[in-house]
Amino acid sequence: MPAALFPSRQPGAQPPHSAAQTARPSTGRVARLGRRTAAGLAVTVTLAAALPSPAHLASHTAPAGPEVTTFTGGAFNGVSAVSAADAWAVGSISPPQGRNFRTLVAHWDGTRWARVPSPSPGEPDVATLAGVSAVSAADAWAVGFYGTAGLRTLVLHWDGTRWARVPSPNPGAPVSSTALAGVSAVSASSAWAVGAYGNTEKTLVLRWNGTRWAQVPSPSPGGAQGTQLLGVTSLPQGGAWAVGCSGSSSQRTLALQWTGTRWTQAPTPSPGFSACLNAVTAVSASDVWAVGWAARRHNGPAQTLLLHWDGTRWTRVASPSPRLASTELTGVSATSAADAWAVGGVVRHQVSKTFVLHWDGTCWARVASPSQGSSVLNGVSGVSSSDALAAGSGGTGSLALRWTGSRWVIS
């Protein structure tokens, strides 16, 4: 998930996602887009290359019962819940015929997931949705990218009746690519979307003012080399945070704060040889969580990384990370100061399984979570202490989990 819009993984390290072989382009510097683009397949996208050819599409209800739905050939990259009976999950899926991935949007009504039609640029373009944010039953945003030789931003909006494409800036066009990885909306007139653009990768921040999307200047530290934003969260009071990483051979964590007038970089711990932040969530201006991974050495296994903002500074908080395994956190969601979830994947012996942590106000602890074949979770959205949804991929298709208040079950 998260593979990442511009895959956020330490070069050469064993990635903590699916055991399926990762496709790596043979030319060009790899840009990091860590969201998974096909079931069980983590694809590293070069800004100058298209995704690999997909398998055929099928959707079915799994044998476990009518409440368990998977979309074969697809993967969820993000999830956002308005209530226990109203949530969206987005990603990409391979069509029954055709060479490239199309957008995947599914709706949760409290009982089952159902696919909803979503715009997707035609062949030969690939199209994937990397993030989603729902404000109400009639207001939700999904963002990602499309293209072949050059990527372009893709923004969709839900008005309560249908998903429609909305124009969005592409500062890299026509000479370089532009893509979006995350979105956060707080009202019909306020939303942020983040990603990266340019052949050397610069941070990209777009703002919705109720009428149109416009680019807002944002810092690109490290000479813009390998710089990318992968997650964003906004506060009702007007503040916002965006996270990601910068650097190529050795990545450093990156956090940008919206002060109300401009984006500024805040110092963040960046342990080990390489580290990156994939997602961020805020309870208040003085209670913010960011998650990702850190590797102690070049080509070494990844470990979980959890940072907390207390209103003054970012500090690293201890988090479980299995020994003799590679583990990454790709999504995070907090409903209160004593209730937060972080999700991702753990790879051991070339097999990937879902990985879930919970914050109870005192410490992060691992919580058992089901997998479906080789699995990974790319996003999570909490509604209350007794209700949450997580989404990703497992086996040959999409995977969605639901927290019942006592355990995680496949939904």
State the predicted function of each range:
Residues 1-25:
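N-terminal low-complexity Pro/Gly-rich stretches
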Residues 16, 31-43, 133, 183-184, ...:
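Generic alpha-helix initiation/capping and coil-helix boundary signal
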Residues 55-411:
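Residue-level hotspots at or immediately adjacent to binding/recognition sites across diverse folds
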Residues 9, 24, 29-36, 162, ...:
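Basic polycationic patches enriched in arginine
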Residues 2-5, 26-58:
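Secretory targeting and sorting signals
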